[in-house]
Amino acid sequence: MKMEEHMRTDLKRVPTMKIFDFAIFTKSIEGIVELTIGEPDFNTPGHVKEAGMAAIANNRTHYAPQRGTAGLLSAISDDVAKKIGKVYDPATEILVTNGVTEGAYAAVTAITNPGDVILVPTPTFSIYMADAAIAGGTAVEVDTSKTNFRLTPELIQSYLDEYGDRVKGLVVVNPTNPTGITMNQDELDAIADVVRDKPIFVIADEIYDQLAYMEGADQYPSIVKSLPEQTILLNGFSKSYAMTGWRVAYMCAPKPITDELFKVHGFAVTDVATFVQDAAEEALRNGQEDPAAMRAQYQERRNVLYQGLQELGWETTNPEGAFYIFAKIPDYLEQDDEKFAYDLAEKAKVAVTPGSYFGAGGEGYVRFSYATDLNVIKTALDRLQKYCAARR
């Protein structure tokens, strides 16, 4: 008897993570330069590491409060209020999670009944498609390639017209992975108007918010500003503070929604390690300059990579946030993006991520990550130029 045949059938709908299989392949190639990395190449700031180590030395190694430590919850509330002007009650409207990955899982699981539809703008990282399937719902990919990779009210409305009352959630990732597109506040306000007063939750994934390149009042656009009562806000420390391995993030929502989210969070993970939360609190309280320093370097790298691709004749997005450029494969090269990426890795020793791994609209594109040293980017461009020249 094959016991795996008797497991939950919904899991067959969970997409496989081809991106990780591709990463294993590229790492096997000696001398390859990788523009595939989805995490900062910086190390966690020293003062944040010291706070974590001090917490361990002080025996902050026991169970933490399930919702989060009082200190971190308060710091999150203050930080969110400063950035987007919304005050969440630290005692009742915020949960500390094991990364945004867990927050996304808790959010989708908590709002989805069997048969419900979650609208997921694509191209995007596949986590929300998987979460919807695990929850017994259906992720419907909203292909934004038709609108220059920007989510528009008209595009959302077309899917609402098609799926009607089945739609339970809309995911809004801003800035976006893999395109780097960042919607401004006017765009987000218009999106909010489409779902306002409908029984539709907005899951606002803002993990890259401090890596947006706008300045002044436009630096932190958020759909929370115009639709707080329907929005579940997800954010964390992985991208802005180079803390991917610490696994700490948070979710914010009105108390009645947070109480339901807590049921999923509490039974799934119990809590986030106390010393990790102490380090995250240090990041928010005393590390406000850290994201800005990283952002300045990302901008320099973006400019070099963008200019280099333009000179090679590649059609690309010009990212306004995160650390990715999404580029259309030129017509004279292999148009199957997966085949192209494997060939480029083998023959030019340059690793980029196939666009189709990010869902509808990604076909024929590849993602370049500039979360790497400037010299690596220049080497990759030089190798790409030679690869392209040999195939014209």
Task: Say what each PLM segment does.
Residues I29, A135, D197-K198, L312, ...:
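Helix C-cap/helix->beta junction micro-motif
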Residues P45, Q230-G321:
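PLP-dependent aminotransferase class I/II
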Residues S158-D161, E334-Q335, D343-V352, F358-R392:
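PLP-dependent enzyme catalytic core of the Aspartate aminotransferase-like
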Residues Y298-Q299, L312-K347:
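Conserved PLP-binding catalytic core of the aspartate aminotransferase-like
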